[in-house]
Amino acid sequence: MRVIDSHTAGEPTRLVVEGGPDLGPGSLIEKAACLEAEHMDFCASVVLEPRGHDAIIGALLLPPSQPDCAAAVIYFNNLQNLGMCGHATIGLAVTLAHMGRIDPGRHKFETPVGIVEVDLQDANTVSVVNVESYRLHKDVTVEVPGHGKVTGDVAWGGNWFFLVKESPFDLTLENVPALTAYTKTIRQALENAGVTGTDCAWIDHIELFGPPKDPFAQSRNFVLCPGGAYDRSPCGTGCSAKLACLAEDGVLAPGEDWIQESVIGSTYRISYQPGTTKGVIPTITGQAFVTSDAHLIFNPADPYRFGIRPQNWTTSWITRTLSVEHG
């Protein structure tokens, strides 16, 4: 299995170029559903230890079904598919350029939540025009054990977010353990209170905000991802959800830039245009760098060839693959 690794503003992406599972015919949405239902063993093996770690986002490269798209992609982490991933889309564009598949300029990628446009400005700099993003609920308050009442907004930026304007902890790397524990408690409180996205969707990302360290930035954030890792980047889909809230609150005008800083100090330049229905069309600009080009090896004698994970996870895809390849 060939993979190419990159990082975008510090957050890693692993693009599976060759050797992924057969997802059968159908739309990209159907293929994403097949990946999550039948091949999470593949996903875990790609992103988890000993080959990876829980902060890696996987991206399965597929042929596009639309003639005007350069590629199709399904994003995943160690638990599930992701409808969209901003940092990984930036990494995808830079990686495809590294492979010689695209040149600088505008391109379209198919994702399970819609077509995403990118502008490859140079070998490392990419602007992503994300799917339409919107705020579902403003000022939702939940009781968080040990912290009292916490208020935030529920918004969609390609994934579901609960955005909290304040944090009891300074948003620094030293406080990552405390920030992680706090945001996990918030996420559980939302679940206990029955707070969801549209169609009862799980709110799997929690985003905290605070004052920036960078004098050119307007805000600093900490983002808890679904698998329990924190986002090293400012989080593209989280920035999209943030833009939807800023727009609706009248804080940021269309086309006006906002510099969003991450917990590690990396930044995205973000802006929006009004959406066609109820939200905004975000543009996220950041940089990615290719870090490795490798082949993953699945040795039948390796007890951790499926990744280090709970014992009740299935191993159907790799088991079938190994039985074919090794008899």
UniProtKB/Swiss-Prot annotation:
Isomerase in keyword set: yes
Top-rank lineage group of the source organism: Bacteria
List the lineage, top down.
Answer: Bacteria, Pseudomonadati, Pseudomonadota, Alphaproteobacteria, Hyphomicrobiales
Gene3D superfamilies in the record, alphabetically? Diaminopimelate Epimerase, Chain A, domain 1
Which PANTHER family does the UniProt entry name for this protein?
TRANS-3-HYDROXY-L-PROLINE DEHYDRATASE
Q: Which family does it belong to?
A: Belongs to the proline racemase family.
The intrachain disulfides are none
According to its UniProt record, this protein's enzyme class is isomerase
Keywords, sorted A to Z? Isomerase
Q: Which reaction does it catalyse?
A: trans-4-hydroxy-L-proline = cis-4-hydroxy-D-proline
The UniProt entry annotates the active site at 85 (proton acceptor), 235 (proton donor)
Which protein, by its recorded name, is this?
Answer: 4-hydroxyproline 2-epimerase
Xref: InterPro entries: Pro_racemase_fam
Locate the residues binding substrate.
86-87, 205, 231, 236-237
GO terms (molecular function) for this protein are: 4-hydroxyproline epimerase activity
Enzyme Commission numbers on file: 5.1.1.8
